[in-house]
Amino acid sequence: MKRFVLLMLCLLTIGGASLAADQQLDLQQYVLDNGLEVILVRDTTAPTVAVDIWYKVGSANDPIGKSGFAHLFEHMMFEGSPHIPDNGMDQLLEPVGGSSNAYVSTDYTAYYDTVPSHQLPLALWIEADRMGGLDVTQENLDNQRAIVIEELQRSYDNRPYGTAVKALITVPYSYEPYKRPAIGNIDDVNKAQIEDVLSFHRTYYVPNNATLVVAGDIDFDATRALVDALFGPIPRGDDPPALPEFVPVDQEEAEYITIEDPFINLPALLVAYEIPPLIHEDYPALDVLSRVLSVGDSSRLAKRLVDTGKALQADAWIFDNRGPGQFAFILVGNVGVDLAELEEASYEELQRIIDEGVPQEELDKVIAGIRSRGILGLETALGLAESVQSASYYFGDPQAVFTGVDRYKAVSSEDIQRVAIEYLEESDRHVFNVVETDAEAPPPVEPYAAEDVVEQEPDYRYVIEQSEPPPPLDSNEFNFPTITENVLDNGLEVVVIEQPNMPIISLDVYFAGGGTAAPQDLPGLAGIAGDLITRGTTARSAQDIAGAIEQVGGAVGSGGGGDSLQLGVFALIEDVDLAFELLADMTLNANFPENEVERERAERISALEANLAQPSFVAGRTFGRLLYEGHPYGNATTFESLEAITRDDIVAFYESRRHPDNAVLIIAGAITTEEGLEYATQHFADWEGSAEAVSYPALPEHSGRQILLVDRPGSTQATFRIGNIGIQGASLDYFPARVMNHVLGGTFSSRLVQNIREEKGYTYGIGSGFSYPADIGYFRVSADVRNDVIAPALEEVFMEIERIQTEPLTDEEINDARDGIVGEFVFGLETYQDFVESVASYKIRGVELDRLNKWLGYIKDVSKDDVLDIANSYIHPEDFIIVVVGDASEIQEQLETLGEVTLLEAE
C-alpha cells in the first residue's frame, strides 16, 4: 500500500534528473533574432515528440492585489488565438493522438504539447499562434474565472489539509513575491479584468521571455526550419520588469500557527524552514539531507516512525525555486498517536545527523537513487523536454541534466552537518498544527460575471502569417520491443520484454485472484497480504530487503487488488542478480512477521480514517459498494474487518494463491529472452503447487434509478459518481466502447467536458469511462460541481448520454476519434512500465498478448453503428446508481427534482 500522502509534489530538480556526468544529450541550442531561446533534443527511441515552452513568468509576477493571475492567465491561453478558435487546440490535437496541458510554478509557466513525431508542425504552429496573440473576451474570461474558482475550492477549500497546504507554500517565505499562492485567492481572481489579461500577455508572453524545447524523434534541420519560419517573425517585446532581488532575512524566533480544518479525520503537523535557491552551493547538501531522512523504506524517518507504527506519513521534502526554497517535515500520525511525539522524533533524527554525521554508505545510496530515478525521468519525450528546460532555466546549460550530478557526488557528511546547523535552527521553524474542528467551512464564493457583455474585436499583439498548420512530416513506424511468452515445466508463465536501450531490470510477479479469491467476510485481506509480501522473509527482515535494494538505487513493491496480488523489483541492469535473488526470496519465502502485520493494520486503519474525509473516496467507495452488492468488487474494507484479520488469515490466503500455475513473471529491460529464461529457471524451476481457479458470483440486477446522497455538512462542492454495470474485462467490445467514450467524456474535447466545463463552467473537470477488470466492469461518469448546479449538471450528463445513444456520430467525429486513439497508442506504450502493465492486464483478464498487435486494426474497424450499439447496450441511465457526496442542506432539494433521494450519513 502506498503511504497516505498529505501533499503530492512533483519535484523536478537537477539532482532528480541527473545521470552520469560523462553523458551528453544530442542537442542543438540557439537564439532567434527576436530573443527566443531554442533547444532541440533528439531521441529516436519512440516516434513521439514534445513541444515544451516555458515563459519566465509565474505566481511571483502576479500583480499586487491580484494573486492567482498567472494561473488564471494560463487558463486563458487555451481560449483561442488568431487562427485557433476557443478550445480549438484540443480539437486539433486529439484527432492526431496529441495532447496539450500547462502548469504554473512560482517562477515560470509551462505549456507543452505531445504528439506523434510526424505531427510536430501542428504543435509548433499552435504555440506560435498563441505566442503572437490571444483571443480575450468578457465571456471567456468569466468562464475561465469560474473554472479557476471551482478548481481552487476543489483543491484547497473543500479538501482535507487544503488550507494547511496553501499556508505551507506561502507563509514561510520572507521573499514577498513568494508569499502569494500560485492558484490565488478567490477575491483576487474575481478582480481580473480584460485589460489586465491583455497587458499580461503583452508584457510577459514575448519571445525574448521564453525558452522553446523540442524533444524526441526529430530531424534537426527540418525542425529548425519549422521553428524559424513560425516563431522567427514574431516581434521582440519590451524586456519584462525584473523581480526584486532576494535578500535573506534572519528569523528571530519560531512561528507557530494552528489551522482548524473541518474536513480532516487525522491531525497533521507541518514544519517548514526557508532555504537558499536551487542554484546555491548549499542546496545539494540540503537535498541529500532530505533524502537521507525520508526517501525509501530504509530511510531514517521511515525506520523511526513508520516501521514502528507511529506515523502514517513522515516525510522531509525540498521545495526548490529560483528564489528561496523550503525544507519541510510533513507528519501525519496513526490513530491515537500524539503528533508531539512525531515532531520531537523528527528533530531528534535531525540532531543525530548534526552530532554524528552521515556514513558514506548512506550518501552512496542517495546517489544511486538519483541515478536510477534519473533514467526513468528521461524515458518519455515530455520527461526529456522538462528535464532539459529545468537544466537550462536554473543553470543556463541543458547538459546539466547529466553534469548536475557532480554537485551531489561532492556532498560530504560535513557539508550536511553544516547546512543543517545553518538553515534548520529552532528559531527558523514555521510550525503548522492542523487540527479538527466542528466549525462550519466558509460558504462557497460565487465567481464574478459581467452583466452586460459587449462584443469586442480581437486585439492581437501579432498575427503569424501561416493561417493553417504546415503539413505533417513523414511518419515513423512504432517498433514494438521483442515480447516472448514461455512456460516453465511447473506451469509458471514467463514473459520477457526486451528493451536494450533501457539500462534497467524490472521484475514483476502477478498472482491471479486478489479480493475475488479471499474470504468475503474479511474485506481488505488481499490488500494487507499483498502489501506484506515485501516486508519480511524467512531469511530477511523488511529492513534487510529495503536496505539491500535501495543501496543500489532500486526499489521493491507489492500490493493486492480485486483481481490479483503482485510484487516487483526494479534495479539498474548491473544489479540483475540481486534483483532476481530478492524477487525469488519474497515470492517463495514471505513470512508475514507479526510486528509487520500490526504495523500494516495500524496504517490501514489510519489511512481509512483519513480517506473517509475525502469526498472523492467516499463517492467511489459508496458507488462500488452499491453497484456490486454481493460481489467481491463491492466488498469494501471496514474498520471492523481490519481489526478482525489475523496473521493466520494472511498466511493462509497467500499460500492459497502462491503457486506457479497461478502466476506470471514479467521481465523487462536490457535483457534477452534467453537470459531472462535462464534466471527464471535458476530461481523458480523447483517451485511446486497448484492453485484453485477464481470463480465469480452472479452480479446483482439493478432496476430503476437510485439516488443516494451522502451528507457532508459544510462541503462547498457536490461530488458525484453515476453509472451502471458495464463490460466483461476481456470482451472485444472494448474497442467500440473506447471510440464511443472518446467522444462522450474521455478527452478534453469530448462532449461532456465541452458542455459542462467549458460552456457552463460548472466544474473544473468531468470524465466518463469503462473499467475492465477480470470479471465485469462498470460505466461511470465522475465530477465535482458547485453546490448550486448539481441538478443542472446531472441533467446535462443525461442529455449527452441520450444524444450519443440516439444520434449517430458525424463522419468528422468518428474519424477524429479513431485517428486520435490510434495516435494515442504510442504514448500508452512509451515506457517500459507501460508494457509491463499492459502485459499484466492482459494476463489477469485472460486476453492473448497477440491482441496488442491487432489493437490498431480493431480501432480502425469501429463503425458509427458499433458506437450506437455499444452506447445502448452498456449505458442505462434509467437504472443508474447515482451517488452524490455533499452538504444535504444545500443540494437535497435539487436532487429530489430528479427522483427519490435516499439520505446516507457519512461513515
How would you describe each model-predicted region?
Residues R145, L198-L230, D428-R429, R621, ...:
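Non-catalytic, conformational "gating/processing" segments within enzyme and secreted inhibitor domains
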Residues M1-F4:
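Positively charged n-region of N-terminal signal peptides that target proteins for export
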Residues L6-G15:
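Bacterial N-terminal signal peptides
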Residues S18-V38, D219-E260, A268, K303, ...:
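Proteolytic maturation boundary segments
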Residues I149-S155, F246-E260, I367-G377, A571-L572, ...:
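Short, conserved secondary-structure transition motifs
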Residues D188-Q193, V197, L642-I645, I650:
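Alpha-helical scaffold elements lining the catalytic groove of polysaccharide deacetylases
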Residues V41, A46-D62, G68-L72, N87-M131, ...:
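M16 family metallopeptidases and their MPP-like homologs
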Residues A128-Q138, L230-D238, Y347-V358, D585-F592, ...:
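A common structural junction motif
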